[in-house]
Amino acid sequence: MQPRKTPDLGCRNIDLSPIHASLKEIHAKYRDDFSGNVATYIPELAKADPSLFGVALVTADGQVYEIGDANHLFTMQSISKPFVYGFALEDHGVDHVLSKVGVEPSGEAFNSIVLDERHNRPFNPMVNAGAIATTALIKGKGHDQRLARLLGKFSDLAGRSLEIDHGVYISERATGHRNRAIGYLELNFGMIEEPVNEHLDLYFEQCSILVSARDLAVMAATLANNGINPLTGQCALDERYVQNVLSIMHSCGMYDYAGEWSYRIGLPAKSGVGGGILAVLPGQFGVGTFSAPLDDQGNSWRGIRVCEELSERFKLHMLKSRSAAGVVVRCSYRGNAMRSKRRRSSSEDEILNRRGATICVFELQGTLFFGTMERVLRRITEEMATFSYLILDLKRVLQADECSAALLSQTAAMLNQQQKILLLTHCPEHFGNSGETINHERFADIDCALEWCEDQLLQQEQPEWLRGGRQIPLPAMDILQGFDPSEIALIETILLEKRYHAGQIIIREGDSA
């Protein structure tokens, strides 16, 4: 098997990302929960280790987050069905495929022999009858060429070369009597054509393809990215049919749990009895999970819990209204390139020119939700090693949901652990509408925040007599630089000392000189 090639997106501190931390927290919550039972109707599946548990999330632009046993290999099983449906659409187009396989939920078990007698076709491509009919549509000259096409297409989706677990394939082939009955029943009614045994072998083989939770997340991210694999940049599925695939996943992808899944979690998804679940948030990311113990509906028990937590925590329901992501970081710069309006002495200027780059400013814009915040957090973790103070300006942020407030609060805590300070400007007391208070440095605008950061840097380097509001000796004043001691002493005799209380106005712009 070829090694995976993940693009270098520059995020060197991925473990510090609040998104990675959230995935880690969710994984830890269910790691020791062994509810459910491993599938046993296929002998090879019964050998699965119930303790293995992996979670991966891949964004539509290729950032990979993975936790636990995310690289453990298992067989796709029914997760292969929506993709083969997409391949059939590429081969024949929508109208022809619809004439052979419907798109309506059946209300029956995934291995039901019940067919749509009115239209003389299986109800949908997610039940076994529909999946067998879909596989029968895959073009190629003979079994070997058709199998090579399927493996090649799945490898394009995963961004690496995939293989078949021949032990599982042989086990499925030896025990797949019900599927054989379905195949020959479909042949009898003219739903599929010969060679039936070849179609069935291909179906058993596609279900036996080895993948990991990470692979599933990449495949899901490919669907989220309109069919373009975000790791390789290769088109793995024609963009015209991505919507069709996601639609059938949304309505029929989770067996008898499909309706409740749509109601509670709201993401197009597909599960398999091998323990995998794949879920997609179009335009944003894909999720892959693996845990072999299944619930009563045949879905991974831990996988369902992970997706529920992610959807609730990050407000991911597909029907939740949100604006397009766009560019969220309007501009960024450092404190040595953009200074506050506060006038400084030449010695202070020298310090700030030298150390000002440790002040980092991000001006944000648009709508903040999971997809846009992930990009902001990635930028933060990429640059974190080079700054001590981070200013996030929210002046141009139009809307922010609860997820963005929670992620920002976690970011502040993470930066604090790294001995760095987060400053927010133009930020409401309660960020978003969640009531989650982000208890960190707040300022009215960027200039005030820059001045505060500059003061911190100056306090770290200035002489002791400049700290704590102490009086500056005359020789240290910029205006007297170049004068010798006798001249300074003479000037001191003619100066008049005046004292002002804190907050007292010394001079106003426009006053007479």
Where are these regions (language model features)?
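The feature marks cytosolic C-terminal regulatory regions of anion transporters and related permeases
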Residues: H317-A413, Q417, L423-C427
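Short acidic-hydrophobic, aromatic-tinged amphipathic segments that line or gate anion-handling sites
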Residues: N439-C448, W452
